[in-house]
Amino acid sequence: MGSYALPRSGVRRSIRVLLLALVVGVLGTATALIAPPGAHAAESTLGAAAAQSGRYFGTAIASGRLSDSTYTSIAGREFNMVTAENEMKIDATEPQRGQFNFSSADRVYNWAVQNGKQVRGHTLAWHSQQPGWMQSLSGSALRQAMIDHINGVMAHYKGKIVQWDVVNEAFADGSSGARRDSNLQRSGNDWIEVAFRTARAADPSAKLCYNDYNVENWTWAKTQAMYNMVRDFKQRGVPIDCVGFQSHFNSGSPYNSNFRTTLQNFAALGVDVAITELDIQGAPASTYANVTNDCLAVSRCLGITVWGVRDSDSWRSEQTPLLFNNDGSKKAAYTAVLDALNGGDSSEPPADGGQIKGVGSGRCLDVPDASTSDGTQLQLWDCHSGTNQQWAATDAGELRVYGDKCLDAAGTSNGSKVQIYSCWGGDNQKWRLNSDGSVVGVQSGLCLDAVGNGTANGTLIQLYTCSNGSNQRWTRT
């Protein structure tokens, strides 16, 4: 993970306690639906619950926060695996060539071991967070420096680290499927293979992982490029044991239900998989539960690491992406994850799905052609029993279709299209369902509107200033 591990385009089930409901009549009163409580937890902490299936649930630890008693209390109680957030990276462990400094890394390692936790090593070879002396090298000199660094760090921790992220973030973003243009890549295309072979010789007992971000969606070129590399390595006997999926989910790289397929396909190559740096903008409980269940569904998924303890500890704290609030209190996402780990599938959408019918048209809110593609604009269509007209209200204020797609506003101005998009917890996917029949976007303050007061099949849906017109009033059927 690095300071740029998210795309620059921007950043996009909990316990079923209170589900927002749409009005039953035009001027009816909205009814709150109370769902049965979830299954009782067999274990009361994340690590213990994960251990029931032979997995771990870990967190990233920063040495500078180990004097914070709230931080260490939560981390000590909840997690059974630790990753040093920055302390084992290249600039921290070898600030001068050949002069290793493990003081901060050892502080994290020792705290973990003293508190009964295992440790993941992160990371040995990476284009980022290189000390100045390494940045100035190239070619064979850089290659030798990489080898020496791997040997030096792994010798210090030999037999102590259960998994190492040997290589981090070597593939380019976008649709090219190419390697990232870095100083390490320019030292020769075999640099990743050399790093893994060096690491195996340095510590045969550690699992050796490749780690990257934006590789969770099976259809993406970057994912396919990583898959092809791992397949090639396995075919040729290059010692790779596991693949880490960072899972920094956001609007530019949202959670997709095919993540489970991705994990399964990599596991089928004969490697373990792990979710290594999980954080999700807005911490939607349903998405956290889905990710947890994806890991649980794949026998070779070793476990999950969240990238920080509280929101205030996160590298993206303004996006509130973790399981604990700034004050250390648990979020709904925490409960959803714990329930999933304890065997209760919290990822199922609320069981209150139904049609949303326009008062003026008598037609239903419809996803054209039952499309599941993000960005598909909604329309009016004759009501029927298809899943593309079944909308479930969640306690987070979402309106979901197909379980993992949300009613989504593409903008905040009049005329902005209303579409489906993978649920990610943003305010543009949250709606107020009012007793007058209006459906108002939380982010925009505008109403769900049938374009041009239209009533015919195919009339598109947009946002527009609320007017109490019949094209802006809806009932639940």
UniProtKB/Swiss-Prot annotation:
The segment(s) forming the GH10 domain are 42-340
Q: Which CDD domains match?
A: beta-trefoil_Ricin_XLN-like (cd23418)
Recorded GO cellular component terms are: extracellular region
**What class does this enzyme belong to in the EC scheme?**
hydrolase
The UniProt entry's GO biological process terms, in alphabetical order, are: xylan catabolic process
Q: Please write the reaction equations for the catalytic activity of this protein.
A: Endohydrolysis of (1->4)-beta-D-xylosidic linkages in xylans
Answer whether the UniProt record assigns the keyword Translocase to this protein: no
Signal peptide, first to last residue = 1-41
Q: Which keywords fit this entry according to its UniProt record?
A: Carbohydrate metabolism, Disulfide bond, Glycosidase, Hydrolase, Lectin, Polysaccharide degradation, Secreted, Signal, Xylan degradation
Q: Which GO terms describe its molecular function?
A: carbohydrate binding; endo-1,4-beta-xylanase activity
The places in or outside the cell where this protein is found are: Secreted
Entry keyword annotation includes Cell membrane: no
**EC number(s) in its UniProt entry?**
3.2.1.8
Residue span, Ricin B-type lectin domain: 361-477
Active site located where? Answer: E169, E277
- InterPro entries listed in its UniProt record: GH10, GH10_AS, GH10_dom, Glycoside_hydrolase_SF, Ricin_B-like_lectins, Ricin_B_lectin
Q: List the disulfide bonds.
A: C364-C383, C406-C423, C447-C466
- Report the family membership: Belongs to the glycosyl hydrolase 10 (cellulase F) family.
Q: What does this protein do?
A: Contributes to hydrolyze hemicellulose, the major component of plant cell-walls. XLNA and XLNB seem to act sequentially on the substrate to yield xylobiose and xylose as carbon sources.
What this protein is called in its record is Endo-1,4-beta-xylanase A
